[in-house]
Amino acid sequence: MKSAGTACLALALAAGAQAAEPLKVCLLTHNAPYSDRASGRGFDLATATAVAARLGRPLEPVWVSNGEKITELEDSDFPTRRLAKGACDVLFSVPGPARDSLRGMPQLSLGEAYYGAAFELYGKAGETRNSLRQLRDVPVAVQAATVGAFGLRLVGAKIRTSLSAGEALGKLASNEADFALVWGPAAGAALALSPQPAAVPVAQYTPPAALSWNEHPATRATDEALRADIDKALRALSASGELQAAAKAQGIPWHAPFAATYSLGEMNNLR
């Protein structure tokens, strides 16, 4: 009986130790508003902290060095190889679909979409034009070489090329542009560094599918149970409003997952 009790205790302790294993999350060192090691802030860092708490596991950030100016979707270098090699358990804010963001990485898989991100339209206070189709022949500031810039060309806007989200938003104050079309999370980071009172989100603007993406957690494909647990935690955090509050704290415009997202077909619909 004593040996049986000892065995049960050992099993219980082993189970407890396993449950307490840290949740390792790969985060880029300089990637505001998602993660910033120096300030200890960022939407992905806050999300990771909340998910780990829901799972009853301590959070272990795995910081990955990167350039300091990566703020656009097109420029992000997600540390997918580190995830595949087991350096961490999950990445957050990975855009779908997997055939694009995880191309050449069959050992990885995306979880459920838990929020959407898009190019957002900023204008001056009282602006009533609220769709891309109303921007033909209108001066619009946009960061060069982005999907947003291509979309503006399709609708016939007068493009005012900028080198950063902050510069695009600044062109409203200098009257070089009537609008700025900026990747939403990048706008949040730029406005946190340099507030632009002249740049306000355009009321009633709905991002077109061509300029919208859904964001997912990414795990190793074999970690099905972990992926399901993370999806469940993210659904609960969204239902409670915690994700929305974390996004707002970083200046990220909040969107529930979109029904339709970027594709070449959706881009053609802008014409």
Where in the sequence are the language-model features?
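Sec/Tat signal peptide C-region and signal peptidase I cleavage site
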Residues: A15-A19
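Bilobed "Venus flytrap"/periplasmic-binding protein-like clamshell domains
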Residues: N31-A32, A38-P58, A117-L169, G184-A186
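Extracytoplasmic small-molecule ligand-binding "clamshell" domains
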Residues: A20-V94
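Ligand-binding clefts/hinges and TM-proximal coupling segments of bilobed small-molecule sensing domains
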Residues: P58, F150-R160, A233-R271
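Periplasmic-binding protein-like
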Residues: L28-N31, A113-G123, A192-R235, P253-R271
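A ligand-binding cleft/hinge motif common to bilobed small-molecule-binding domains
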Residues: A84, F92-G104, D178-L211
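Extended ligand-binding regions for polar small-molecule ligands
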Residues: G42-L55, A125-G126, R133-Q134, V138-P139, ...
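Bacterial N-terminal signal peptides
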Residues: G5-A14
